[in-house]
């Protein structure tokens, strides 16, 4: 998931 508060680490 490249969007949101953390655009990295998570899908």
Swiss-Prot record:
Keywords: Amidation, Neuropeptide, Secreted. Expressed in abdominal perisympathetic organs and abdominal ganglia. GO terms for cellular component: extracellular region. It is found in: Secreted. GO terms for biological process: neuropeptide signaling pathway. The modification Proline amide is found at residue 11. InterPro entries: Periviscerokinin (IPR013231). Disulfide bonds: none annotated. Mediates visceral muscle contractile activity (myotropic activity). Belongs to the periviscerokinin family. This is Periviscerokinin-1. It comes from Perisphaeria virescens.
